[in-house]
Amino acid sequence: MGADLKQPQDADSPPKGVSRRRFLTTGAAAVVGTGVGAGGTALLSSHPRGPAVWYQRGRSGAPPVGGLHLQFGRNASTEMVVSWHTTDTVGNPRVMLGTPTSGFGSVVVAETRSYRDAKSNTEVRVNHAHLTNLTPDTDYVYAAVHDGTTPELGTARTAPSGRKPLRFTSFGDQSTPALGRLADGRYVSDNIGSPFAGDITIAIERIAPLFNLINGDLCYANLAQDRIRTWSDWFDNNTRSARYRPWMPAAGNHENEVGNGPIGYDAYQTYFAVPDSGSSPQLRGLWYSFTAGSVRVISLHNDDVCYQDGGNSYVRGYSGGEQRRWLQAELANARRDSEIDWVVVCMHQTAISTADDNNGADLGIRQEWLPLFDQYQVDLVVCGHEHHYERSHPLRGALGTDTRTPIPVDTRSDLIDSTRGTVHLVIGGGGTSKPTNALLFPQPRCQVITGVGDFDPAIRRKPSIFVLEDAPWSAFRDRDNPYGFVAFDVDPGQPGGTTSIKATYYAVTGPFGGLTVIDQFTLTKPRGG
């Protein structure tokens, strides 16, 4: 059920020194505090209180709202999804929706999806309320609730319609800041987490993007003894940001969980309600696209094409070419759309890497995706998998070698004409305790995965086969900072002129989201309209 709530945006700006989101939620509570019950005002300072499976129930026996987060629909200017999870059946899950000045004006009933974790036999239920017919470039307030629990507040802003300025951010490979170590030395939660997985969430809020792209390997639940707790830890950490702005994911190899669905992605597919790509229910949510302003974002699932065996199970080729056919059609449609200037691809594994003794680049991506990126002139690719930051020169075409080495078409590093080639970014310093910035080759070289060997019981996977090559495409590498993200500021320009995206890579330097600018560059191209 969707909400039809078109009201004008509040014209008042937040007072100096008060955050925009605090201003919005405080205003909403003042207007409709009685509408959310006696605890309404207290919601403004609500915080995560631990994994949902361990929450103390209220008097009614209902668990609280857990892991509140947002996703965009296919049209980010009019569609949003509010999601939260529990491990118990709940009654009447719903979202109260309104504006900061007018209060809650409608109620949207949520649909519930569930999966049963094969390792713990615990069933997780995720409620998704689809908000539709929203007004572009507008602030909303909402409260997620089900019977017998206290509502949780959030704010949401729709994307602008057409060519308007906007900001988004991107990083991958986050993990969680909650390690969950027991007295006997075992970990019940993510065993490669670090405090920086929490710091980066605070840092994203300091930048306040319209949305954040999370480039795969979200929480590493497939490495954890307790997968349910690890997912809950991840959402508890990130709801500090994701309840205020959509975090749009790409699935990584560590979202592949043995026993959870036919190809291992039931948890990921249940927690997120991303735009429908028209794929079968079994493949739902593994690839998708959405439009924000003049930017078309396409999220891909690279395990379908990668040679590397990096998950709990080897699933290369699982879609039978369905994802590639969808991608080609999606890119063609984007380039036919006169309202789209920029095409950005978000994915996990990478076609470029100068890390030694780590994952490396994957030939499967170079074979399956890069020819399409060239054909349809994709502007920007953001990925993770390698736990550091680096970027390529604009790339177009490939050498006629077995590794299909991408060809740089320009070496200017500050101002880049994106019509000449695609810039690839590795942004994998999201927070894990295994960064790779200290593992970079002294001079740019690349280990390319060209295949896999037979299954090795000692490592419980198929070992990668590597070919080492030079990396003439390498433009910038951050050796010094293990953690960070990139912010992208879209400037639509003027009719008849150019449009640009200014990219700023920030190193996250400690508690409270400390930031240091490390790399900047600007993509530019003729404006389409």
From Swiss-Prot:
**Region entry Disordered: which residue ranges?**
1-20
Q: Record's Gene Ontology CC terms? A: plasma membrane
Coiled-coil ranges (or none)? none
Q: Fill in the PTM field for this protein.
A: Predicted to be exported by the Tat system. The position of the signal peptide cleavage has not been experimentally proven.
Keyword check for Protease:
no
Q: Which InterPro entries match?
A: Calcineurin-like_PHP_ApaH, Metallo-depent_PP-like, PPA-like, Purple_acid_Pase-like_N, Purple_acid_Pase_N, TAT_signal
Q: Identify one Pfam family in the record.
A: Pur_ac_phosph_N
Q: Name one GO molecular function term.
A: acid phosphatase activity
Q: Which residues form the signal peptide?
A: 1-52
Taxonomically, which superkingdom? Bacteria
Q: Which key words are in the record?
A: Signal
Record's PANTHER family? ACID PHOSPHATASE RELATED, PURPLE ACID PHOSPHATASE
The name this protein carries in UniProt is: Uncharacterized protein Rv2577
